[in-house]
Amino acid sequence: MYAFVRFLEDNVCYALPVSCVRDFSPRSRLDFDNQKVYAVYRGPEELGAGPESPPRAPRDWGALLLHKAQILALAEDKSDLENSVMQKKIKIPKLSLNHVEEDGEVKDYGEEDLQLRHIKRPEGRKPSEVAHKSIEAVVARLEKQNGLSLGHSTCPEEVFVEASPGTEDMDSLEDAVVPRALYEELLRNYQQQQEEMRHLQQELERTRRQLVQQAKKLKEYGALVSEMKELRDLNRRLQDVLLLRLGSGPAIDLEKVKSECLEPEPELRSTFSEEANTSSYYPAPAPVMDKYILDNGKVHLGSGIWVDEEKWHQLQVTQGDSKYTKNLAVMIWGTDVLKNRSVTGVATKKKKDAVPKPPLSPHKLSIVRECLYDRIAQETVDETEIAQRLSKVNKYICEKIMDINKSCKNEERREAKYNLQ
């Protein structure tokens, strides 16, 4: 049976036969205490534990001394321990400083079995540094055993390519040194991790700069949005003032008006009276007032247009631009006016003998557009989308006029049918 031990003096692990542990006869693989300190001989080959190799003379391997060590695992043979170490199944506890004491003994290291050596990396140290120090320890022991006189400037890595031709254990020495492949693999992994860390730091710095730029742009965008809203308010107020100064229609030459009749035609007079009765329109210029103010149960929409307060609140919960525009047109003009009007005053092309109807008041159409604009501006700030949705106002009002005329015709048919019965 073999034991995987860790010597406390140099924190190096070896796979040794259990016969190297003094006063230790395990009955199973779990019959040990990993917190207990055992006395272990270093150099199992010199103890003659192997049945096929006879014991050597003291002049060949020197006097062996006991060393303090911890047993980390037991196995039936060395290959099981090797597989457990490579698969990281053996947990190595932290080294306690209480176990490491100065005993005053002169330690003479014999030839170690280094075929399976596990280097425990201390916290905060690089893998290459740990392997480098372990190689230095191997060089020191080889100097003491073989009488080599290596200078302090000798690189520990030369042990991999240098060998002592006079020793009998040339093959065992090549197997005993820490595998160069393991050292190079650890070094490559460390360099790869350093490269990945450098890339991550560069990516982090690039992301931080992008966030700073986006924050600046967002701040500028917020300032532009506030400025645009302020300009919109000023534009609407300017439009109200201009519409009040111009009156209900386009500018008219006063000299022509005086030379012609002073009173409007009966048809126009009736039209003005209808609009006045339905939407409370005040054609006379009035002081500029803010929009959407309440007064005596009515809401001011601008340019002297007033609508019922209750109907206005019901309109605000209407879904969709089409329904909102149609209901607002009914509130401003009324169904009686809309059924006898057209949006632009141009006769339809569907009928050859169609007579054009009077157009709707341009300034009232502008009020409808402004109300719809205020509604859309609460949903989006995209000017392209706002312009696209506002361009459909005439279409919505035209559809409403057609619906009113259609319902009137259906009502007339029902009445005619009822009279015939």
From Swiss-Prot:
Any one annotated GO CC term: Golgi apparatus
PROSITE patterns given in the database record = BEN
Please give the residue positions where the record annotates the modification N6-acetyllysine: 133
Show the coiled coil region(s). 180-243
Can the keyword Acetylation be found in this entry's annotation?
Answer: yes
**Record text about domains:** The BEN domain mediates DNA-binding.
What protein am I looking at?
A: BEN domain-containing protein 5
Q: Which organism is it from?
A: Homo sapiens
- Gene symbol here is BEND5
